Amino acid sequence: FLSSIVKPGEGPDEYIELMDMDVDREGNVYIADNARMVIQKYRFPEWKLDETFDVGKHYWEFCCLDDNCFLLKDVFGKDGMDMKLAYFDGKSHEVTPLVDEAFPSVNELDVMKCSKFNLYRSGEQLYYYERFTPNIYLISDKGELTQRYTIVSSNYISESDLKGLQREPRKYMIEKTYIKDVIGLFESEEYFVCM
């Protein structure tokens, strides 16, 4: 159904730079337009632009919690990344940080990524994987985080070793000792699988 809402352009119901998308429980599609710093809601099943939420900031990834509240990942300010994970209220236009950086002395944007995605849906559940840590959070519809799972491993990278991977993509690719990224989370009634 996505092909019926492909609307690149600069018109009022179009988007300039599609960055990410999500679908709510009613089937409405939300598109992040990075160029305009907005989230556009296209109502199911007509696929007409229903609402535009002015975020006012750039970000890498988002997901909808309800029809006007969102999570934003890697939110940028004028000097780089401002917030690792944030709650955006589409009515008040407030952006509130939810997670502090695990390694404040490391600029995560300078460390190569295997996956740009850290927000995962599994059935009715929404999860957030905190990069370079063993932490997987369950996210409520109100944007509240509860640490749900901990990946048990001694192979997590230290802050000093992580610093050595900044702006060193070749080193990042060669390094095989540490868990550096999770590229997928899957859950069944019996198992929780990380890749």
Predicted region positions:
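Conserved beta-propeller blade signature
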Residues: 28-30, 70-71, 125-128, 192-193
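Loop/turn-rich, solvent-exposed surfaces of beta-rich toroidal or solenoidal domains
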Residues: 176-195
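Blade-loop segments of beta-propeller domains
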Residues: 1-26
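Asp-box/WD-like beta-propeller blade repeats and closely related beta-sheet repeat scaffolds
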Residues: 15-19, 32-82, 97-106
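Structural motif
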Residues: 37-40, 79-86, 133-137, 195
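Residue-level detector of Asp-centered blade-edge/turn motifs that repeat once per structural unit
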Residues: 23-26, 64-67, 121-123, 187-189
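Surface loop/turn motifs at the tips and blade-to-blade linkers of beta-strand repeat domains
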Residues: 6, 10-13, 52-57, 99-111, ...
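Short loop/turn segments that connect beta-strands within beta-propeller blades
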Residues: 43-47, 88-92, 140-143
